[in-house]
Amino acid sequence: MATRRSKTPAPGVSLRDTLVHAGLESSLADLLAEMPHRILHVDPRRPFREPGSPRDEVMFVRSGILAKYKTDGSGRRQIVALRFAGEGILPRDASAGYGIQAIVKSEVMVGKARDFDRIVDAHPELQRFFLRLIQRNETFGYE
């Protein structure tokens, strides 16, 4: 029997709830969830951030799955990490050596690095929280 796939992403996961579930204090999760941002709807297998482009933004997956990829010598994309609903990709000071694409139709919250940095600078416990998440992600991926 054939099934129909929705043309829109699955309902988004609350960023606030995901961060609180991961161990972040609710008031800090509220600050991140209320940060100025825009929502992107991303189609599968189409890179929306190419390797080498600036990473002056923070991204949180609201629904779907994102892949961080690197291009091998033959030009094929090799997935090095996945981000699921509620997880994020943090900003960098330099260009990133990886690209980002959706695995399935996804919805992504994108904020400016300076807004994110302002919140993190004012609340040092956020640095410790994100450091723990980065260490956890490195355990599972090739980042």
Indicate residue ranges for each PLM-predicted region:
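Cytosolic regulatory regions built on CNB/CRP/Popeye-like sensor folds
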Residues: M1-E143
